[in-house]
Amino acid sequence: MISMLSENEAKILFFLKDLKKTNSVELAIKMGIPESSVLSLIELLREKGYVKTEVKSEKHYVLTEEGRKRKESGLPEDILINTLNGQEKDLNEIKNILNKDFNIAISWAKRKGLIDIKEGKVIPKVKTYMSSEYLALSNLERADSNTINLLKKRGLIEEKERKIVSVELIKEPKESEIGISNLNRELIISGEWKKYKLKKYNVEAFPPYYTISKKHYFREFLEKVKDIMISLGFKEINTGYIEMEFYNFDLLFQPQDHPAREIHDSFSVEGSGKIEDKDLLNNVKEIHEKFWKYEWKQDITLRLMLRSQTTATTARVLASRPKAPQKVFTLGKVFRPDAIDATHLIEFHQLDGVIIDNNFTFKELLGVLKEIFYRLGIKEVKFKPAYFPFTEPSVEAYGYLEKLGWVEMCGAGLLRPEILSSVGIDSTAGAWGIGIERLAMSFLNISDIRLLYSNNIEYIRDTKVKIE
């Protein structure tokens, strides 16, 4: 039975017809394919009786990591001469330019007679220079033995052994033994196709799987949430991760001895901030001392921290004394010390929103929240009374999810008059904060919060976001 030749096998035999004998390295270059592929093809041809092979070991030189670096940047002595450009310079000036290459450059330049050093100055003997070692780094095959020895001495190349398979043609193929996989118009019209064997196709084989780029599912979820807020007429705002305790706590009517300020509940950052608005600072101080009955300290309020709630961004909005009506939101990371497990992370996302409007009511706030959750795909929502330091009245919102039942979604309420009066806002304001990771876990059917940040490529490809 005649064994059909593949197109690449036929190509190798075609090259050998002229060369008679060659090796795997040359064939790989001629065919433009990896040597490993050529070796596999040669072995198939040997088994079919078309070629004979012989394996030889050959020593050759390759660039070390330092050699690759010098090939890109140049050798230190070359850089030194080109830096001098025919002019003498102070040793210290050269040292500052060459840094860690200074000693190597001076040593080799003196050894090669390229410079003199007198009275703390480097005096070049040539204006330009390019060493033979540098030129050899780009073409080791043509380098002479002296240059090779220098490169080895300098640790720029290393000797390695490789196996080369020499190939010799012993039988030429017949046209009927050559298979083709692409039947084109020319072959059909000319009738040439009759001389070849057509490669068999497995019609039951699955087509190749092509992966297309897509957003990370959690990033896609975050963007969908932003789109919903913008579609409801809210404007997005963002502030930095590092915040003063003033905006994270004090302006939100949270006393300076509150447990949330303890080291186990927030991350401290070295240094302190500055608040230009002294009237605002004094207003907050007076309100704290009047209602909380303690001595408010400015050095505490100016301390820096990683924000523990995006309500700090809401606080900055309030501090800018915006005029009603205003509808803004922020979606960003917050940071809290915690033991990382399936339900806790030390950094996570919060969605905070605030509406400032004349005569804005608590009932309207609940309506806005229901609409947000409805657009997120949560059709059933209920509210329970709650307590938060900066809102009154306050509620917790719960949404019904098929697999989990009633799940807490957010905390919300009307901002306390103590907060609004400190920033000089006469209108009513409603605010809320939503834990985004909890929502995302529900929508993506994820039981481990760490999977929201997975870098497992297969898992990322297979996970989809769908919000009805």
Swiss-Prot record:
GO terms for biological process: phenylalanyl-tRNA aminoacylation. The keyword Repeat does not apply. One of its GO terms (cellular component) is cytoplasm. Its EC number is 6.1.1.20. Its main location: cytoplasm. Its cofactor is Mg(2+). Tetramer of two alpha and two beta subunits. This is Phenylalanine--tRNA ligase alpha subunit. It comes from Saccharolobus solfataricus (strain ATCC 35092 / DSM 1617 / JCM 11322 / P2).
